[in-house]
């Protein structure tokens, strides 16, 4: 149907000759209203997600800086070097000849491509394990884009694009997310944006001395993350439902029952 030599397109005449399944006007209005209602739900969910994210950002600003203290906690916070409070493992890439997609060995986390929605994902495995991270560790990107933070829920081999950080609770995980932008300042000026083990270990962190206070703060923020994730999941399901409805309603596969009144 396309015409032309180098630049292809559909002519006005051919466009007019395309046959489309068209219902009566009442059914058209009913279909349009049904899809508009779903669009309204998606928009409402998007607004709710944005609101929850803004609330979480404000909460992080209050709780992770000590500006707002939780009831029952009054001990002064202290400044510590990251290297003094956490176990840090810098990644080392195995030889590519050991990479595989058959899940032989351990999953391989090499960089940002292996991180999605703050979680490590499995794209490939390696039968040669150089440096290892463990279920629950924090994953920090050390190459551009520098400083992206995630967690892993499985043991893995880590390549040179990331480091693994072990800390006994999720306070540090949330703190590093809160301070993500700091890493880009450290990497400025280098030929290839990256941070090294010394820069990571020397990062100063102000945190509660009381581990219970750390855990309570982490729980509050993790609960907010769970609420946001639930809304995002519901929104994704609604968007998928709309696609299915369009496939059914706009092709005539499924017909709506339209009242006889105008």
Segments and roles (model prediction):
Residues 17, 25, 70-92, 206:
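Non-catalytic DNA-recognition/assembly elements of restriction-modification systems
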Residues 37-79, 233-262:
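Short amphipathic coiled-coil heptad-repeat segments
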Residues 4, 43, 126-127:
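Short, solvent-exposed loop/turn positions at domain surfaces
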């Amino acid at each position: 149907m396309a015409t032309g030599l180098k630049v292809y397109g559909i002519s006005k005449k051919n466009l007019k000759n395309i046959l489309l399944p068209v219902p009566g006007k009442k059914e058209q209005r009913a279909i349009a209203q049904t899809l508009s209602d779903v669009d309204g739900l998606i928009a409402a969910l998007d607004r709710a997600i944005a609101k929850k994210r803004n609330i979480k950002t404000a909460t992080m600003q209050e709780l992770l800086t000590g500006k707002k203290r939780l009831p029952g906690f009054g001990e002064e916070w202290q400044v510590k070097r990251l290297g003094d409070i956490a176990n840090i493992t810098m990644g080392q890439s195995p030889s590519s000849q050991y990479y595989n997609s058959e899940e032989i060995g351990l999953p391989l986390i090499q960089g940002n491509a292996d991180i999605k929605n703050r979680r490590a994902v499995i794209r490939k495995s390696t039968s040669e394990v150089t440096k290892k991270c463990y279920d629950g560790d924090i994953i920090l990107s050390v190459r551009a884009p520098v400083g992206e933070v995630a967690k892993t829920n499985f043991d893995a081999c880590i390549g040179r694009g990331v480091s693994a950080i072990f800390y006994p609770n999720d306070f540090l995980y949330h703190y590093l997310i809160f301070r993500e932008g700091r890493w880009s300042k450290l990497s400025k000026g280098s030929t290839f944006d990256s941070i090294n083990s010394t820069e990571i270990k020397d990062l100063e962190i102000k945190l509660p001395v009381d581990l219970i206070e750390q855990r309570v703060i982490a729980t509050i923020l993790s609960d907010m993350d769970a609420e946001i994730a639930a809304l995002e999941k519901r929104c994704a399901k609604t968007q998928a439902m709309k696609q299915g409805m369009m496939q059914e309603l706009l092709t005539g596969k499924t017909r709506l029952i339209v009242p006889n009144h105008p």
